[in-house]
């Protein structure tokens, strides 16, 4: 298997504010978290784990041959859960890179994960995250995050507002992160920052503390499920691709 020094961790907490028991919601006949895991598993990495506080989620993943790490339900963020899970991976001293894939993207493309890893290994960035070029209409129709980058693709700022102001094309931020091990360790040791709390974006903690985030372009905006409306869209998308035999 490739990239044996990389661990992929999918944080998945049963409790959800806007969609009850979100990871166990069905898309077709398969739960959301199972779909995420199966997509991620197609990247072909040995060290792929679901980090959860739930026996129900663990049961779903184990039934399809996945590996589970139990983490405390009180852990505040997905990144903190990722780090706690990393510490529990057997022989984790051999892991140099950790990819955090959100547990709410049922159609995430394995190629995006591999691209993060390649960019991370072939750069000096602390963290690498994917972005997608989108037009104003696409991004205004969502509550998602845009990012401003420099000419080398280094992230300058992330915002829930459209940035840069006045543009017609934007960079949509996909919520996945590839960390160097020492960068993940440093991140969780830092206190939440002013900009992070203002924008409600924990990646700003990285930038405010002088760490670097590189971006890699991917083709498609993945569907994220956070609300009942998002779930309906995901089900509709699944029905459409099923009709096409994809």
Curated annotation (Swiss-Prot):
Keywords (A to Z) from UniProt: Cytoplasm, Lipopolysaccharide biosynthesis, Nucleotidyltransferase, Transferase
Designated name of the protein: 3-deoxy-manno-octulosonate cytidylyltransferase
Enzyme class: transferase
NCBIfam families named among the record's database cross-references: kdsB, PRK05450.1-1, PRK05450.1-5
Function (record text): Activates KDO (a required 8-carbon sugar) for incorporation into bacterial lipopolysaccharide in Gram-negative bacteria.
Gene: kdsB
A GO cellular component annotation in the UniProt record: cytosol
Pathway(s) served: Nucleotide-sugar biosynthesis; CMP-3-deoxy-D-manno-octulosonate biosynthesis; CMP-3-deoxy-D-manno-octulosonate from 3-deoxy-D-manno-octulosonate and CTP: step 1/1; Bacterial outer membrane biogenesis; lipopolysaccharide biosynthesis
Keyword Cytoplasm among UniProt keywords: yes
Single GO biological process annotation from the record: CMP-keto-3-deoxy-D-manno-octulosonic acid biosynthetic process
Native species: Rickettsia massiliae (strain Mtu5)
PANTHER family with a match to the protein in the record: 3-DEOXY-MANNO-OCTULOSONATE CYTIDYLYLTRANSFERASE, 3-DEOXY-MANNO-OCTULOSONATE CYTIDYLYLTRANSFERASE, MITOCHONDRIAL
Main localization category: cytoplasm
């Amino acid at each position: 298997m490739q990239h044996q020094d990389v661990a992929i961790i999918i944080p998945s907490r049963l409790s959800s504010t806007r969609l009850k028991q979100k990871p166990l919601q069905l898309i077709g006949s398969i739960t959301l978290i199972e779909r995420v895991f199966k997509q991620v598993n197609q990247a072909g990495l040995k060290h792929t784990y679901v980090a959860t506080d739930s026996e129900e989620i663990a049961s779903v993943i184990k039934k399809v041959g996945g590996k589970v790490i139990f983490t405390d339900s009180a852990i505040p963020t997905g990144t903190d859960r990722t780090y706690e899970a990393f510490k529990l991976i057997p022989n984790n001293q051999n892991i140099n890179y950790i990819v955090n894939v959100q547990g709410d993207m049922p159609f995430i493309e394995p190629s995006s994960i591999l691209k993060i890893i390649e960019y991370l290994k072939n750069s000096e960035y602390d963290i690498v995250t994917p972005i997608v070029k989108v037009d104003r209409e696409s991004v205004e129709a969502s509550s998602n995050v845009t990012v401003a980058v420099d000419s080398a693709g280094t992230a300058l700022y992330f915002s829930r507002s459209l940035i840069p102001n006045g543009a017609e094309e934007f960079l949509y931020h996909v919520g996945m992160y590839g960390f160097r091990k020492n960068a993940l360790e440093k991140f969780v040791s830092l206190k939440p920052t002013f900009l992070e709390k203002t924008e409600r974006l924990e990646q700003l903690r990285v930038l405010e503390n002088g760490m670097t985030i590189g971006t890699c372009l991917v083709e498609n905006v993945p569907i994220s499920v956070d609300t009942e409306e998002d779930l309906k869209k995901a089900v509709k998308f699944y029905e459409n691709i099923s009709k096409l035999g994809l």
